[in-house]
Amino acid sequence: MSEENPVFQIQRVYLKDLSLEQPNSPQILLEQEQPNVDIQLGVEAAPVADGIFEVAVTATVQTKIKDKTVFLVEAKQAGIFEIRNIPEDQMGPIMGIACPQIVYPYLRGNIADVITRAGFPPVHLAEINFQAMYEQQQSQLASAAPTPGVTQ
C-alpha cells in the first residue's frame, strides 16, 4: 500500500551557478546617476533518475547607467526533488509552481549577498507568483500549438 502513496520530498537545494561581472569598474563607480535595473527569471525542470527531478530557478540581474553595464549577476539555484505516485496532470504544477517556490528564497538570498559583497547596495528580488507565471507559460504554449484538424 505504501508503494502507492504520493511522495514529495526535497532531497537537496544547492547553488548550481553564480557569476558576477563588473566590466566597467572602477570608472562606472564614480557615476552619480541612478542605474536602471533589469531582472529576468526562468524555471527549468528535468528528470535526473526514476522519480527524481531537478528544478532550477535562474535569474539575471543587470544594472546599467545609460548604455554601460554597472554589474551583471547570473545565478541558478536548483533543488533535487523526489516525486513519486503523483497523477501525471499534477506533475506540471508541482514542478512549475511548488518546487520553484521552495528554491526561489535561496536564490533571492544568494543574489542579494553577492551584490552586497561586490560593494553595491543589495538588489532584493520581489516575491514571485509562480502559479501566475506557470499559467502564463501554459497559455503561451497552448496558443502556440497548432489547433488539431486545422491546416495552415
Swiss-Prot record:
Compartment(s):
Cytoplasm
Respond yes or no to whether keyword Chaperone is given for this record: yes
Q: Which key words are in the record?
A: Chaperone, Cytoplasm, Protein transport, Translocation, Transport
Q: Which domain of life is it from?
A: Bacteria
Show the GO MF annotations: unfolded protein binding
An example GO biological process term is: protein folding
Q: Which family does it belong to?
A: Belongs to the SecB family.
Free-text function comment from the UniProt entry:
One of the proteins required for the normal export of preproteins out of the cell cytoplasm. It is a molecular chaperone that binds to a subset of precursor proteins, maintaining them in a translocation-competent state. It also specifically binds to its receptor SecA.
> What is the protein name given in its UniProt record?
Protein-export protein SecB
What gene is this protein a product of? secB
